[in-house]
Curated annotation (Swiss-Prot):
Name of the protein this chain belongs to: Putative L-type lectin-domain containing receptor kinase V.2
Extracellular side: 24-276
GO terms for cellular component: plasma membrane
Glycosylation sites: 78, 124, 159, 190, 257
Transmembrane segments: 277-297
Reactions mediated catalytically: L-seryl-[protein] + ATP = O-phospho-L-seryl-[protein] + ADP + H(+); L-threonyl-[protein] + ATP = O-phospho-L-threonyl-[protein] + ADP + H(+)
Gene: LECRK52
Gene3D superfamilies xref list: 2.60.120.200, Phosphorylase Kinase, domain 1, Transferase(Phosphotransferase) domain 1
EC number: 2.7.11.1
Keywords in alphabetical order: ATP-binding, Cell membrane, Glycoprotein, Kinase, Lectin, Membrane, Nucleotide-binding, Receptor, Serine/threonine-protein kinase, Signal, Transferase, Transmembrane, Transmembrane helix
Signal peptide (from-to): 1-23
Pfam families hit by this protein: Lectin_legB, PK_Tyr_Ser-Thr
GO molecular function, one term: protein serine kinase activity
Amino acid sequence: MSLLLKMLLFSLFFFYMASISQCSDPTGGQFSFNGYLYTDGVADLNPDGLFKLITSKTQGGAGQVLYQFPLQFKNSPNGTVSSFSTTFVFAIVAVRKTIAGCGLSFNISPTKGLNSVPNIDHSNHSVSVGFHTAKSDKPDGEDVNLVGINIDSSKMDRNCSAGYYKDDGRLVNLDIASGKPIQVWIEYNNSTKQLDVTMHSIKISKPKIPLLSMRKDLSPYLHEYMYIGFTSVGSPTSSHYILGWSFNNKGAVSDINLSRLPKVPDEDQERSLSSKILAISLSISGVTLVIVLILGVMLFLKRKKFLEVIEDWEVQFGPHKFTYKDLFIATKGFKNSEVLGKGGFGKVFKGILPLSSIPIAVKKISHDSRQGMREFLAEIATIGRLRHPDLVRLLGYCRRKGELYLVYDFMPKGSLDKFLYNQPNQILDWSQRFNIIKDVASGLCYLHQQWVQVIIHRDIKPANILLDENMNAKLGDFGLAKLCDHGIDSQTSNVAGTFGYISPELSRTGKSSTSSDVFAFGVFMLEITCGRRPIGPRGSPSEMVLTDWVLDCWDSGDILQVVDEKLGHRYLAEQVTLVLKLGLLCSHPVAATRPSMSSVIQFLDGVATLPHNLLDLVNSRIINEGFDTLGVTTESMEASSNVSLVMTESFLSSGR
């Protein structure tokens, strides 16, 4: 059980066995740090008005400051809790943070007293808001700073990191044990039944956005009269102070005059003790010096392992660059147990970022030469700015020696090919497959036509299509992607992609284009519908190539023969037929015959219909003037479907 939870439980139940004292409140439920205060445990009041709740030198202790009289929170025992609010300024000075940590809590409790209760009743009628800090138990981890709400239970109902929200919604973290004064506002609204907690440095005004909110009626949990105050649990090296406090049980609280707050005392004695320990350590000679030298050499070798060479031109890509050390820790040293998958270009590892605990996927690839590295990283940085619901977000990269690491959002369901081929007990139904096709089409259309530049993916296949927890598809792995401006052809490069998805013109010229992506997408549509790979051994030679097999079955009048046997007859024949025919059109060997992705989406959505003589077009071996040769024009298509088919390029003079 964490210290914050222990502290909250302790503060909620330290009054457990006593009875409520129904004495009158001389302030009428409103006060600003007046003299009606009661202290208990390790707590005292300094002459300047500063309350110190923890002042232990040898072992951890507990202190309490509370308002001496019970305050009325209800008009009757069975009534509803009225609106109330409080604000206070506290400071925690920790000379040395420990894993055990320390903390402070504001409490509303039925009794006063600092008692230890071994058996906790879950109906103690108490409310507590706690602030806890502790040193991380990881070498490179961030210190813990938490705020939590506990209402009448042994578990925290709500908690979050300590800090405050700016007006633009950005969270600014606060170190609770920095020794600097921090102001807290706790407000309960009777109308909305909402409890808000806000905290901030006293150097700024109260933020408009609460840090922590919880909507819950407190009436069942509070008596008519309750005590309010603070409890503190600390380590031997921490001191907790309450500098100012204001409360109102009838609505909005009066602000504290910050100019009159007492100063937090310097912990010179504790710092002096630390300095003496350091001086003694430095005076040790001989064996200690040898040990230090050995440790220094070991540390140097460890740092050398994570050493990265950053060239001047990489500075512009800084926001997209991860350190190798972070990725090494995230993937547990790139262990095989963390491998999500692997292909011809490298392995993909699952990782957890050490600071944020965000799950990521890291693809490790080898870049064959330094030539073109700068241009490659420029494209990676550009793609990293893409934001689309059907694209896996590229978070950044890391470069170390001859290796590149691409960092993506983690997709919990993994890649599509696992569901198609490696998970016989989890079969994708037709509705899921059709939605996946539409998701990928939407993402690819965004890359080709809707962004400021044209992005050619160059490696569309099921292994690069990832699924989230709701089985929504996202196109990922931009390791081979190329960019070019709209209206300008991409440059010739090495042939990249996966066998079976590479278009004929790409293998001849080495020049990728949007139409080569459309070709791969067409093969993908056939693959997900038929449940088999583009090229593979089948019963007869005519079935070896997927596109040829589907076309032959269409020619013979039984195109539904190719549907994945695992689907049985649980599919919409009209949708399946559309996908198969559209897949053949997209994978046509003539680049100019293939539709653009915007047209593909129109066909899939039913906005446009395929031409009635599409089989002749797909079977055509000689195309002189595109659809006009077959008596099909964009005008005639527009007349029948109200949408014209947009082709990817001008027609070539050869066909399938």
